[in-house]
Amino acid sequence: MAREGEGGRGRDREERDSEFMDRLVHINRVAKVVKGGRRFGFAALVVVGDQKGRVGFGHGKAREVPEAIRKATESAKRSLIRVPLREGRTLHHDVNGRHGAGRVVLRAAPAGTGIIAGGPMRAIFETLGMHDVVAKSQGSSNPYNMVRATFDALGRQDSPRAVAARRNLKVSVLQGRRPGGEAEAASEA
């Protein structure tokens, strides 16, 4: 048996959970019609992230709101993805994503811009740890479609290092920098 100060399964889980930030995106009341009337339940959509480039979303259903949120949070922690961030604050490149009739456009932004995004997208960027981004949603405004479209776009995000490795190039060549850089170009002019 675990004594105080030695840890234990429960405490380890609490420490692991403390590294994540979670946001409730949407709660939906649903009804099942039965012989005696209606039986109500709740569905929750939650976004979880570590504010260091990992984020996930989950969906939970239960008869009570807290239980639905707990299930959604656990589901979100199991579906975390890593998103490469430029300078730890924005995207490497502009990207589009879609799910169903929902489409999103995500754009990298200069420092100080902030998170310019509406609804569920803002929760995703805050839990991801992104500080500067401009996002636009088009088509469906259904929170589930918007979240999945945003994750589709974030999944298409590539770091320059990953692109260079895929093309068998050096990152400096990929970004158009040459040995010597601007000093060499200025001496030639």
Curated annotation (Swiss-Prot):
GO terms for biological process: translation. Pfam families: Ribosomal_S5, Ribosomal_S5_C. PROSITE patterns: RIBOSOMAL_S5, S5_DSRBD. GO terms for cellular component: small ribosomal subunit. GO terms for molecular function: rRNA binding; structural constituent of ribosome. Residues 20-83 form the S5 DRBM domain. The keyword Transport does not apply. Keywords: Ribonucleoprotein, Ribosomal protein, RNA-binding, rRNA-binding. The keyword Calcium does not apply. It comes from the Bacteria. InterPro entries: Ribosomal_Su5_D2-typ_SF, Ribosomal_uS5, Ribosomal_uS5_bac-type, Ribosomal_uS5_C, Ribosomal_uS5_N, Ribosomal_uS5_N_CS, Ribsml_uS5_D2-typ_fold_subgr. Belongs to the universal ribosomal protein uS5 family. With S4 and S12 plays an important role in translational accuracy. The N-terminal domain interacts with the head of the 30S subunit; the C-terminal domain interacts with the body and contacts protein S4. The interaction surface between S4 and S5 is involved in control of translational fidelity. Part of the 30S ribosomal subunit. Contacts proteins S4 and S8. PANTHER family: MITOCHONDRIAL RIBOSOMAL PROTEIN S5. This is Small ribosomal subunit protein uS5.
